[in-house]
Structures are given as C-alpha cells and as structure tokens.
Regions:
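N-terminal glycine-rich FAD/FM-binding segment characteristic of electron-transfer flavoproteins
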Residues: 1-216
Length: 216
C-alpha cells in the first residue's frame, strides 16, 4: 500500500479539504494502480470518504486526541505510514497540516512539497507544480526521496465523486508524550471559513467603511 491521506474533521463532519484530498488521492492511486487509504481521528464516517474514492479508512479514537496537538497526531500518522509501507502521504494546506508536515518529514525521512496546485506532472520521479511567493508565482518541485509528502493547496483540485467499496479499521492510538494540554477551544460557527470558501471578496482601505461594501 503506497498512498495515505490525513482527513481532518470538525463539528462531527469531514472538512471540505478532506474530501478534496480524497478526490486528489484517488486520481493518483488510479494512475499507480494502488489503494487509497485515509486516516481519521475520533470521527467515524467511512461512507462519506468512500463516496470520494477512499478504499480503506483507519480510524484512530482516543480521548487524548480529541483536540489537535501536532506531535501526538504526527506520531500516529507516522506509525500508520511505517506499518503500511506508505510511499506517498497527502495532506491539506490547513494550519494544522502545516504543523504536521515537517514533523512527518523528519520522522519518515520524507521529501515535502507544500501548496501543490494540481496532479503531479510525473510520478517517476515525483514532480509537482506548487504556488509560491503568496500565490504570485509557480515553481516545479522534484521529490526524489523513497517516501514523499504532498501538501495540496485548498480548492485547487475540487471535489470529484468516485464511489468505492470501503473497508474500515479501528486502530489504537500510539503512545506519545506532549507538553501541551488544550483546555478550551473557541470557534466561530454558522459561517463558511475562508479556507473552505469558493469565492473570497476582498476590499481595501479605499472603501473606507462597511457602508460602501455594496460597491463591490
């Protein structure tokens, strides 16, 4: 098994970015003739992932992983990757994923390309196009490690339905130590986050105040 995705969830649902990763990972898995495997933490909804092309989901449930902390999450993802001989790990470009990526790269001795915007130009060697300079330019990155990590830029590939028969597997959390303890999390609700929005409208100082927003 060679392709693994990390699926983030919030408020009992998979994030849009998780379903985009499933769509993107499915396309690469089909090119390689391999299975697509997902890892989820404290969230069991395998059928949603199956709808977007995931063949197998590994569900890790543990009270200590209720809130995201980078090192324990990275340790568990690395353990799954090593146990399953993963050669390609795909993450989103969320803040949490960007915390995880360098930790995973060190643990797996992996190459890492962030902000990837489309399917690989080549799989041997792995060659990807990524945005850089705050999306003002693009660069081509060649990853030649045995294990590699892709950070997919949000909303760059989209959601593509590709239903599969899925196998669900429960896994115990790997023993880890952390110096951090999350006591409380406050999040806004009822609105679409900027990361998940299809269209973002931005207004500068020239608008002066909210009374002029109707102009754009």
């Amino acid at each position: 098994m060679g392709i693994l995705i990390y699926t983030e969830s919030e408020n009992g649902k998979f994030k849009k970015s998780a379903l985009e990763l499933a769509s993107y990972g499915r396309a690469i898995a089909d090119q390689l003739g391999q299975k697509l495997v997902a890892v989820s933490f404290n969230h069991k909804d395998s059928q949603t992932l199956a709808h977007y092309g995931v063949d197998r989901v590994i569900q890790i449930s543990d009270p200590s992983l209720k809130n995201f902390t980078a090192r324990p999450y990275a340790a568990n993802l690395a353990a799954v990757a090593k146990e399953n001989n993963v050669k390609l790990l795909i993450l989103s470009s969320s803040a949490n994923a960007k915390y995880l990526a360098p930790l995973l790269a060190v643990s797996l001795s992996a190459g890492y390309a962030s902000n990837v915007v489309e399917l690989p130009e080549s799989l041997q060697p792995l060659t990807v196009k990524r945005s850089c300079f705050t999306n003002k330019a693009f660069s081509t990155c060649i990853l030649e490690n045995e294990v590699n990590i892709i950070g997919l830029s949000n909303n760059s590939y989209g959601l593509r339905e590709n239903p599969k028969e899925i196998v669900s597997e429960d896994k115990s959390a790997a023993p880890t130590e952390t110096r951090l303890e999350v006591e409380n999390v406050e999040k806004s609700s009822g609105e679409v986050s900027i990361a998940d929005a299809d269209i973002v409208v931005s207004g500068g100082r020239g608008l002066k105040g909210p009374e002029n927003w109707h102009l754009i």
